Amino acid sequence: EPPMFDRSDRVRVIGTAHISSFSVAAVKAQIEAFQQDIVAVELCASRHRALTSNRRLDKEGLLKVVKEGKAPLVMLQSLLAAEQRKMGLDEGEQPGAELLAAVKTAEEANLEVALIDRDIQTTLRRAWKRMKFFEKVKILWSLLGDDEDEDAPEVSQLLEDQDLLTSLMEELKTFSPGAGAVLIDERDAYLAGKIAALEKSSDLRILAVVGAGHLKGIEAHLNESTQPQEAELKELEVLP
């Protein structure tokens, strides 16, 4: 079984590995076994569209993104390039496959699907704002310095594989504590707040599917006497 905890007799949170074929099967099995009414998934609308629409961006398009000042996308592209090479993506599943499996399995069973993650643009802009200048330079330099790497993935692949975010979190927190806090700690609080809001809004059974790296943080927030409230969630959605 995947790592998980039961918040109550009607709320279960399971943790997954974003490139694990085992996670895909485990997610499907849990949805079939838990008899939930709502499946909450660690996706925002933007990431869901990216995973389902095969969005592409060629090098000319990437240059346009850079010129428009969308530095967080450059940060993501560069970090994903390094992580993909390190991990090899040899698990046989598309990154984010278990999240899509959760959505698809829920829809096939006519269950409600809730996308509970903060918008990826907000997360990346807040992370970029927290990074020190030399950290930004290092990331941009790595982007420019990968030209001779024959194993480097195409830009189109990188943008399709946005769900490597969870596997990057601990590494990034060491590299840049400020940015790591945004990607890990803030999103732990945000995801917990969204789960708590769903729990309070009805008596329905809820199964939440999140990256395993968020599981302990979410559980800690849900066990606190003062869980993230609506005002705090709104604060976490503010662009810098």
Segments (PLM) and residue ranges:
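Compositional signal for N-terminal targeting/processing segments
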Residues: 1-240
